[in-house]
């Protein structure tokens, strides 16, 4: 089986239009994603890039992810040489109608476009400021340690939650590449990570395409849900008398109280 590494970390996947066929007819089946074991707890999905591109699959992914009840992270690819305001306005327009308190936004920082460290850091800071003003919290930032070390000045950034990529060397097609064991390599000056993108050539979940990106959450499932403002629903207590769900919260399994006489059939 593929799933032998990182099983203590909640599993996530991330999607873009490249996880659908070119004509849009074959798309990931979210019922299969919902039924998958180990369970997929969160899904990141590309919303757009810069100020002029919307991922055409985003709305489908968003609606389906909402339907199956997973935690959702819309992400936007930042072009560091372009206006932060135009890019974030585009991101927010794409998200029109989305309850921003129920999702976690992500800025994808992996393109330098020949810009200086100072310029890239400045653009990111402006994007952060705009999103914080609009949503009352900072987004996560996706990148990798080597890129951050070369292109960002962490001392000039606020404290952020980081989603970091690190993979094992690719195996030749059609083989799958195992997940990189958590934790990922951290940029210089960082000591914590929030999400680790562990593979870019993992088995596709949901029946579309061959490969898929996998991610792992640094914490428990309960901590993941709390991060998204959710409560982990506990299973209903089972009544020891009839085996049905019991509305009384304090009943103990396999216990019978004096107030609950048992009706016995006389043989």
Show the residue positions of the predicted features.
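Positions that flank functional sites
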Residues: 80, 146-147, 203
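Intrinsically disordered, low-complexity boundary segments flanking structured domains
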Residues: 1-3, 61, 93-96, 148-153, ...
């Amino acid at each position: 089986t593929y799933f032998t590494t990182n099983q203590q970390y909640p599993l996530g996947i991330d999607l873009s239009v490249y996880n659908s066929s070119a004509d849009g007819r074959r798309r990931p089946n979210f019922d299969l994603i919902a039924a998958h074991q180990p369970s997929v707890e969160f899904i990141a999905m590309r919303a757009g890039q810069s100020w002029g591109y919307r991922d055409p699959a985003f709305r489908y992914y968003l609606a389906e992810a909402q339907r199956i009840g997973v935690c959702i992270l819309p992400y936007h690819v930042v072009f560091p040489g372009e206006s932060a305001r135009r890019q974030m306005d585009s991101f927010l327009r794409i998200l029109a109608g989305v309850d921003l308190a129920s999702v976690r936004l992500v800025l994808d920082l992996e393109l330098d476009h020949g810009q200086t460290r100072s310029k890239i850091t400045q653009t990111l800071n402006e994007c952060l400021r705009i999103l914080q003003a609009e949503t009352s919290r900072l987004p996560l930032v996706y990148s990798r340690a080597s890129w951050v070390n070369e292109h960002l000045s962490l001392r000039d950034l606020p404290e952020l939650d980081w989603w970091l990529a690190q993979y094992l060397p690719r195996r030749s097609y059609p083989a799958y590449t195992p997940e990189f064991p958590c934790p990922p390599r951290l940029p210089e000056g960082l000591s914590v990570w929030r999400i680790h993108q562990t593979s870019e050539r993992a088995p596709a979940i949901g029946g579309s395409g061959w490969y898929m990106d996998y991610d792992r959450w640094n914490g428990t499932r309960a901590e993941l849900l709390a991060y998204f403002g959710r409560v982990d629903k506990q299973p209903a207590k089972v009544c020891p008398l009839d085996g049905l769900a019991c509305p009384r919260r304090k009943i103990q399994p396999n216990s019978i109280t004096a107030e609950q006489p048992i009706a016995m059939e006389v043989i």
